[in-house]
Structure formats: C-alpha cells, structure tokens
Curated annotation (Swiss-Prot):
It comes from Chlorobium chlorochromatii (strain CaD3). This is Probable potassium transport system protein Kup. Transport of potassium into the cell. Likely operates as a K(+):H(+) symporter. The lineage of its organism: Bacteria, Pseudomonadati, Chlorobiota, Chlorobiia, Chlorobiales. It catalyses: K(+)(in) + H(+)(in) = K(+)(out) + H(+)(out). The chain crosses the membrane at residues 7-27, 44-64, 98-118, 135-155, 166-186, 201-221, 245-265, 278-298, 335-355, 361-381, 394-414, 417-437. It is found in: Cell inner membrane. It comes from the Bacteria. Belongs to the HAK/KUP transporter (TC 2.A.72) family. Pfam families: K_trans, K_trans_C. Signal peptide: none annotated. Keywords: Cell inner membrane, Cell membrane, Ion transport, Membrane, Potassium, Potassium transport, Symport, Transmembrane, Transmembrane helix, Transport. It is a multi-pass membrane protein. GO terms for molecular function: potassium ion transmembrane transporter activity; symporter activity.
Length: 620
C-alpha cells in the first residue's frame, strides 16, 4: 500500500500535469475564444455537460478502461502499441502492415507538434494571470514566458532526478486548490450541478448547430492530456494511474469546471479569464506562482515524453542515431536528447512570439491531440480484433462510438486550420517524412551492402581453402546482418591480407518489446577457427553498450578483454544512384541524415582509441 501511494504521488507530477492545467484555458476558450458562445444558462449548462461527458467517455472509459489494456509488456504509447501490432500480427498482408506502420508513425509524429505547443500554451496561460493583478504588466507577459521557457530547456541536461521529488507534492497542492476554488463557487450557485446530465450537452449542439459544433474544439482542450496517461503507463503501472484519476484528479477537475461555470452565470464579465476569476484578490499572486509551477511541471512531462519517443524511434530504426544522455544512474527512463531539446526550445519560443497569447495558441492545440487519439482508436481496434479475438459485433459497436466522438472533436479542431491548426499538422508531416525516409533509405542501403558481401557460411568455407595470415589479438566487427560478413572485414582482408586470431561478428538487434531480460539478451555462436557470431538483443526502451554485451557474452565462452579489442566499423558515404525507389530529394535528405548521425563509436560507447573505421561508397 505504501508503494502504491508513492507511485500514485509520483504519477501526479508526470502523468496528470497536462490534463491538470487545462482549467487554465478550456472554459475560457468556449466562451471567449475565436468561436466563443454567448453566456447564458443554457449555453453554460450545455458546455459543462459536454465537458463532463468528454472526460468520462474519453479519459475514464476509452483510455483508462480499454486502451490501457493494450500494453506492450507493460509499456504504453503509440509507438509501443504499433510495435505490439507488428510483432504479433504476422498474418497481416503487406498493405495492411504498411497501413499500421504508417498511421502509427504519423501518430508519433503528431506528438512532436504537441510537445512544442504544450509548454507554450501552458506557461503563457499561467502568466497571463499577472494582468488580473496589474494590467500595466501586460506587455511583460511574452518576455516573461520566453524567459521561463529558456530556463526550462537550459536545465534539461541536468535531468529531473533532483527536482522530481517535488513534482508530485506541487501537483497534489494544485489539484487540491482546483477543487477548493471550484467548490466555493458551486456552494454559491448549486444549480450548476444540473449540467451533469447529458441532455444539456445534446440540446446545446442541437440549438447552436454549426456554432455549437465549432465550440467542441474548445471543449476538447479539457482532455488534451489523456494520451499521456497511456504513454506513461510503463513508468507507474495501470493501478496507480487509475486510482489517482478516480479519487483525486477527476473530482478536482469537475469541481473546478463547475465552479467556473457558476462564476460565469454570476459574473459574465469574467469570461476573459474565469479560472483566475475564482481566486480571491489576495490570492492572485500566489495562484500565478502555483499555476506557473504546475505548467512548468506539465511542460517537463511533455518534453521528457518527446525524449523518450525519440529514443524509441531511434531504436526501432525510424530515426538516425542521435546523442542520448542518461541523466540518472538509477532510472534508465530519464534521458536527455540534445537535438530534440534545442529543436523544441526554438519551436516553442517561436510559437509564443508568433501567436502572442494562449487564446490564439488554443486554435493550434487541439488538432494534433485529436488526430493522435483517432489513430490510437484505430490501432486499438486491430489489437482487440487480431490479438484478443474480441466478439466482432461488440467490438464494432464500441469502436464506432469511439470513432464518432474522435471524429467530431477532430472535425471541430480542424475547422481552425487557418487559425493555427495547420502548425502541428505541418510538423507531423515533416517528422513523418523524415522517419519514413530514414527507414526506407536504411533498407535500400542494407540491400546494397548485402549484394556486395558473402554469407558467413561462404566466408568460412573460403577461409578453409585459402587461409589468411592470422596475427595475435582480438577483433570485433559490427554487422547489420548476423548472417552476412561485414564489408569492413572483407575490405580489411583484401587490403591488409591479415585477420586477428580471434574475431567476433557483433550484431545489435532491437526487438519490438520494451526490454529484453539479461538471460536472453546475448547469444554467442562459435563458428570455429577462432570466429564467433554474437547477437545482442535489446528492447526499444533500452540503450545498448559494448561493455554490457561483452560482460554477458563472457558467460557464454567469449573471453574477449575490452581493453585489448580492435573494433572495426564501416563508414558509408551515401551517393544518389540513377535508378531507385526513392525520389532524388528524399535521397538527398537521407544522405544529409546519414552524415549527421552520430557514429557507432559514440552510440555503442566504444573506446575511441581502439576503433578503426573503413570508408565505403554506396549508391541508393
């Protein structure tokens, strides 16, 4: 029970930060945004009803009850879900397999846009509360937001280990304050609780028609953090997340939203910022400080999520090797990816300056998350149909309901395409193109390399016929295919006419599971005459290092000394060929990514002084 409580408190700071800061802007956008609706009892009741049932249907039912069942060895998230499908659905034809990979990758690409917008809108909306206290400080809100964001991104390389223990208590205080503020206003206007009944939402949509449909885009802002609940499942487990949601987060959110609704009916003039309207004048400054702290924590969770997503994409072969730094010796999940960090910082600050207010940013926010949720629903359908063999009639009815809700929110959010919703879609399209180009380019590259080499069996037979000179020592050659001889070894043998007395061919394989247990991580095959084949299997959440592989291989008879090994790598220079399945601009993009990828020496933590790189020119 004590461990459960600790996990629940930790989950508060990481999992619920995004959805927990939605009260800062969700209600405001419904009544004061670009498509704001008139403030009257019917509209307030209708919006609150839609908001309540969105939280119940999307978060409580869809995500916490159903989608969280679809875990990949305990891990959640759209890439983990895609990997689960690809691993198990072997019977899927080529077109269906490509469809699943494509939508899964596009869903992951959408999260990059979300990771850029969330810090911008969250911190900006919190600091906008300053003008409630001192309107003269209005012009300082943008500079203050940029300053906070710069500090946030500059501190990423330190990791969250030191301050992470504060996240849970701060967000706990945040939710308690949310609930108390809302409850005070509800007690003044208890009739607002009638909005819980769903017919108010239905009548709102019927009476307001197209305008009411447009407001759905603002209503959706209340559930934008739902995907994080699923993505962070592997860190905290299903039970702590579900319990924390049911007994703290959901009640606090509902109380605050109902409180804001009651405030609007009592004081419509507060529509420009109903959240801060709940706060007594003496508490505005402390509330701005608490809100800013909560939004920084929510932003931190999104940034960390982008780092984790990038690492998964690298391990699964959808992005080139990038520098990944572990910021904690105890927790493997705490990483820092400099390239992702600086890209996010530039994009986030540009959004703050370009849009200028959280209200304008809200138009860009929803479409990325609605599209991701739509893709998660589709992937879940395939899991339930192909892996779990659910009753098709029941499954089809359930999926149709979820899809109708997802499509309604997506349509409402996409209606703001020219008001900023284009931004996350462009980011997603760029990232999707990058990932697909890298995957296809690597496939073409490996095909070219395979056509120029020998199988291990052919090579061993040729050695028996013409044995080369062997010098004392140990050599490791990295190979992309465990059944083929790396070109680096063939080139070395052709030019130097010599091989080491002990040679090991190392192949690193990323499995479509989060982690591989140590007893299955390394396989050593003795080929004879001093040759070995070593296959190291890692999960997509793990970080392979040569020292760990050598230590595990030592138990299987490979007695190589790390300080005595010569490591041979091939360094390919990519040139565009005449005939290829890739267009010329994608070939050039792949070549640029290949040149800028970090070397295998850095990625696998090889000792630089013991590495020999052999250059190869390859046409694709």
């Amino acid at each position: 029970m004590k461990r459960l409580g600790g996990l629940a408190l930790a989950a508060l700071g990481v999992v619920f930060g995004d959805i927990g800061t939605s009260p800062l802007y969700a209600i405001r956008e419904c009544f004061h945004g670009d498509y704001g609706i008139a403030i009257n009892e019917a509209n307030v009741f209708g919006v609150l009803s839609l908001l309540v049932w969105s939280l119940l249907l999307i978060v409580s039912l869809k995500y916490l009850t159903f989608i969280m069942k679809a875990d990949n060895d305990g891990e959640g998230g759209i890439l983990a879900l895609t990997a689960l499908l690809i691993r198990h659905c072997k019977k899927n034809g080529g077109s269906e397999r490509f469809f699943l990979i494509a939508i899964g990758l596009f869903g992951a690409a959408l999260l990059y846009g979300d990771g850029m917008i969330t810090p911008a809108i969250s911190v900006l909306s919190a600091l906008e509360g300053v003008q409630m206290v001192a309107p003269a400080f209005h012009d300082l809100i943008i500079p203050a937001t940029v300053t906070v964001l710069v500090i946030l991104f500059l501190f990423q390389h330190h990791g969250t280990a030191r301050v992470g223990t504060l996240f849970g208590p701060v967000i706990l205080l945040w939710f308690v304050v949310l609930g108390v503020l809302g409850l005070v206003e509800i007690l003044r206007y208890p009739q607002i609780l009638q909005a819980f009944f769903p017919w108010h939402g239905i009548m709102f949509l019927l009476n307001n028609q197209l305008h009411g449909f447009m407001v759905l885009g603002a209503v959706f802002l209340s559930v934008t953090g739902a995907e994080a609940l699923y993505a962070d499942m592997g860190h905290f487990g299903k039970r702590p997340i579900r319990l924390t949601w049911a007994f703290l987060v959901l009640p606090a959110l509902l109380l605050n939203y109902f409180g804001q609704g009651a405030l609007l009916l009592d004081s419509p003039a507060d529509a420009h910022h109903p959240f801060y309207g709940l706060v007594p004048s003496w508490g505005l400054i402390p509330m701005v400080i608490l809100s800013t702290s909560a939004t920084i924590i929510a932003s931190q969770a999104l940034i960390t999520g982008v780092f984790s997503l990038t690492q998964q994409a690298i391990q699964l072969g959808y992005l080139p090797r990038l520098t990944v730094t572990h910021t904690s010796a105890k927790h493997m999940g705490q990483i820092y990816v400099p390239a992702a960090n600086w890209s996010l910082m530039v994009a986030t600050i540009s959004l703050v300056i370009g849009f200028g207010s959280s209200s304008k940013l809200a138009a860009a926010y929803g479409v990325a998350v609605t599209a991701t949720m739509l893709i998660s629903t589709i992937l879940f359908y395939y899991v339930a149909r192909d892996l779990w063999r659910w009753n098709k009639s029941v499954l089809n009815v359930m999926i149709v309901v979820f899809l109708l809700v997802d499509l309604a929110f997506f349509g409402a959010s996409a209606s703001k395409l020219f008001h900023g919703a284009w931004f996350p879609l462009v980011i997603a399209a760029v990232m999707f193109t990058v990932m697909m180009t890298w995957k296809q380019g690597r496939g073409l590259l490996l095909k070219q390399l395979q056509d120029r080499t020998l199988t291990v069996e052919e090579f061993m037979s040729s050695l028996a016929l013409q044995p080369p000179y062997r010098t004392n020592g140990q050599a490791v050659y990295l190979t992309a295919n465990p059944d083929l001889v790396p070109l680096a070894m063939l080139h070395n043998l052709r030019h130097n006419k010599v091989l080491h007395s002990e040679v090991a061919l190392f192949h690193f394989s990323t499995e479509r599971v989060p982690r591989v247990p140590n007893n299955r991580k390394v396989e050593v095959v003795k080929l004879g005459d001093g040759f070995y084949k070593v296959v190291a299997r890692y999960g997509f959440l793990e970080y392979p290092t040569i020292r760990q592989v050598l230590a595990l291989a030592n138990h299987q008879g490979l007695h190589f000394k790390p300080e005595a090994i010569s490591f041979f790598l091939s360094r390919e220079k990519i040139v565009a060929g005449v005939k290829s399945k890739m267009t010329i601009w994608r070939k050039k993009l792949f070549a640029v990514m290949s040149r800028n990828a970090i070397s295998a020496t850095s990625y696998y933590d090889l000792p630089p002084g013991q590495v020999i790189e052999i250059g190869l020119m390859v046409q694709i």
